[in-house]
Amino acid sequence: MIIVVTDESGDDAEKVDEAIAMLKRHRMTVHVMGPVAPFAQEQVTVKWTDPETSESYNLPVDAGPETAYIEQAALNVWDRGPGVKSRSSGFGPYGLTRLTRENGGMYLLHDDGRIPGPNFEIEQLLRYLPDYVSDASYKKLAEQHPLRLAVLRAAQATNQSLTEPLPRTLLAAGIQFDIKPTKKKLMAVAEILDQGLVILQGAEEARKLETSPRWLAHYDLLKGRLLANKVRCYSYAQLLDEMYDKPQAPKDGTKNAWQATSREDGDVAENELPPAEREDAKLARQNLERVAQDHANTPWAAIASDELQFALCFHWQEAFLEPPDGGALPWDKKPWSELTEAQKEAKVAFEKKKEVEKARIIKAKTSDTKRSPPKL
């Protein structure tokens, strides 16, 4: 008997078939206590603070995926914070979990809190078990089921292309120079989303034949998310065009930028969309609501609910963005005596923040032990 205790998934899951064969030859059983895998992701981000310099680092840690291949797109289109980027899958990493199943062992989930969001009861996820089969068998199953193959191809295509979120906050000074490259990136993203939708559309008829709740959830969720983000891209493009044609300066004396934020009057905003985009918005909501209802208390439903709460249309809102070194700040145009109370408070808070950052940098440089962050 072998007992493994780990907080990572490892980076050699491709050797699982070889390991299983060896264990069977020697009639060995493996039990593992390990992490919960992030949903459709290989890594999670862990915050580590150097005890001597107090410097904090966000370090990637291998903890997934829960399946042989990533079956859902990350769709890293908009920066919405770490809590949205990672979700619990409710299962262990594919390689370690399959290793135990093939040899009569157990995989004990240890949730160390590294993944934000809701936890899922394994009893509720039994209908959604990953395909714990060999690599060859997994590929064969995908080829025999057009819907599964379409999901895998659409997820792979978007994951390879959408690597960085679009900037939604632009400095008001010289905003037209920033709008051009932002619009170019936006159009490229919209094209990638369209490509994913074309792939899924080709398997629409196959949806009627698919019996796996897991793959049906994948298909409907991915289609809904692609459509929703396509509408958001259209809305953002309209804002960029309007600001480019008629650039404006923030009225708030503490602001120096414009941020594309979600419109609270979502229904009104969607009714103002052109017919094609309005239909996309309708289909997006239908797919996402179906997932939230038909697959309740699962990662798919959690992501669908999150998408439904994220408005499909944007509007400009005044914001503050630290300019590049040497750039003017909103309160630099007037002497202290002429600043408003709000500007004075903002100026003091900003300068205090910069002093703290400077002190931390100096402390790190003068530390007796100059170490790189560890590889977790």
What are these regions (language model features)?
Residues 1, 24-31, 103-106, 297:
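Loop/turn elements at helix/coil->beta-strand transitions in domains of secreted/extracellular proteins
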Residues 8-98:
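VWA/integrin I-like adhesion module and closely mimicked acidic/polar interface patches used
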Residues 11, 206, 210-215, 291-305, ...:
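Short solvent-exposed coil/turn linkers within tandem alpha-helical repeat scaffolds
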Residues 56-64, 113-165, 306-368, 373-376:
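Pro/Ala/Gly-rich low-complexity, hydrophilic intrinsically disordered segments
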Residues 61-213:
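C-terminal "exit" segments of structured domains
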Residues 175, 233-292, 299, 315-338:
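Short coil/linker segments at helix-helix boundaries
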Residues 215, 220-222, 280, 300:
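Structural signature of alpha-solenoid helical repeat junctions
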Residues 222, 226-229, 307:
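"A position-specific structural signal for the A-helix of alpha-solenoid helical repeats
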